[in-house]
Design a protein with these regions (language model features):
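N-terminal Sec-pathway targeting helices
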Residues: 1-16, 23
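Lipid deacylating catalytic domains
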Residues: 23-245
Length: 245
């Protein structure tokens, strides 16, 4: 009989490899930024990808947002071809993208949904005191860093912003924005990733994603880090995105 712990360790290795390989993938046919839907711009959603990824990771959410009649926008960071730019550089790009979105409605606001480091990028943007973002939902974001970042130099300098005690994880909160989290609690039956203390999604500790005392948790799913953009996570975020919370 195959040892479950061995299977989980192998799976963790595969996730970690994917985490790094993604940083060098999709350099051709970069997905264009999109603005879709007929909703009010004051309640539209900006979808922000994580390190080494691009806007194509949001396909499922695009479908679900459309079904709910919510206008959405995407961004693929341009600061570096491999999408491995710093949180500060990405924050500048976010500011420009949000300005574009709100140009037709200067008094409106957007909601940001960020996966992984995309949540840190959004936090750094929000630290400038802007009033343009009503809600930030962070999915699997290493808000207090992750020990996995200490084991790789792939996707630098982006990965440095996910180190424990990284300056980007310490930025202040914007009083004009409500902050929410969704975390993955993966492989609970064997205790998750043995490298990470406590429950985790294979890459990010739940304690870091939720950063208890700072943000409001919308809940947890049992998905691994790269699987956290399913309908289950969307359902946890839905009330916020529809203005019911």
């Amino acid at each position: 009989m195959v040892n479950k712990k061995f299977v989980i360790v192998i799976a963790i290795a595969a996730v970690a490899i994917s985490f790094g390989v993604a940083a060098f993938a999709s350099l051709v046919n970069r997905p264009p930024e999109a603005s879709i839907g007929g909703g009010n711009p004051s309640s539209s959603v900006l979808l922000v990808h994580g390190l080494g990824e691009d806007a194509s990771m949001w396909k499922k959410w695009e479908e679900l947002l459309t079904n709910d009649g919510i206008q959405y926008h995407t961004i693929t960071f341009q600061e570096s071809d491999d999408k491995c730019g710093t949180a500060l550089a990405h924050a500048v790009e976010l500011g420009k993208r949000i300005d574009e979105i709100l140009r037709s409605n200067p008094s409106g606001q957007v909601n940001i949904v960020g996966h992984s480091k995309g949540g840190i990028d959004a936090r750094v943007y929000l630290a400038n005191g802007t009033q343009s973002v009503a809600n930030l939902i962070m999915i699997g974001t290493p808000n207090n860093g992750t020990p996995m970042a200490e084991r790789t130099s792939l996707c630098a300098p982006a990965v440095w912003d996910t180190l424990p005690e990284a300056n980007a994880t310490k930025v202040g909160m914007n009083p004009n924005t409500r902050y929410y989290t969704i975390a993955g609690d993966w492989a609970k039956e064997v205790g998750g990733n043995p490298i990470i203390p406590g429950p985790d999604d294979g890459l990010v500790p739940v304690s870091s994603a939720e950063s208890e005392g700072n943000f409001q948790s919308l809940g947890r799913t049992e998905h691994a880090h790269l699987e956290l953009l399913s309908e289950e996570e969307y359902n946890l975020a839905q009330d916020v995105l529809l203005g019911r919370r």
